[in-house]
């Protein structure tokens, strides 16, 4: 039996922004946000499931843009999608599609997306 596609249904994002004030009052979340806000530590180690709301809490209290590093492009995409449910304005800096020693240039749209994200960080 095959699967049925529903082209008329768009994938809708569930917004969790209403939960953020309650999550932000958790003592562990407060400790992490206070630590990063005071400049004591820029490293947060947390289980995968709590990372999006934790980072959203840190980002909402930060006076500057929050930059998060991930191990892989796939991790970055997953985290970007999850964070977008918690806070607006999430962007991902796409990876170059070529290796430094290759004579190929990245796609124009990749370069444009990278420039757009870098511009947002500066302005």
Which residues does each PLM region occupy?
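ASCE RecA-like P-loop NTPase motor cores
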Residues: 1-123
């Amino acid at each position: 039996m095959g699967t049925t596609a529903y082209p008329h249904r768009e994938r809708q994002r569930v917004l969790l922004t209403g939960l953020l004030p309650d999550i932000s009052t958790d003592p562990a979340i407060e400790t992490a946000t206070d630590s990063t806000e005071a400049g004591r530590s820029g490293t947060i180690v947390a289980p995968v499931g709590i990372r999006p709301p934790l980072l959203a809490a840190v980002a909402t209290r930060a006076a500057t843009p929050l930059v998060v590093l991930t191990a892989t492009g796939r991790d970055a995409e997953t985290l970007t999608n999850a964070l977008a449910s918690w806070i607006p304005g999430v962007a991902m800096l796409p990876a170059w599609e070529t290796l430094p020693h290759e004579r190929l240039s990245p796609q124009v749209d990749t370069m444009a997306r990278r420039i757009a994200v870098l511009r947002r960080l500066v302005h």
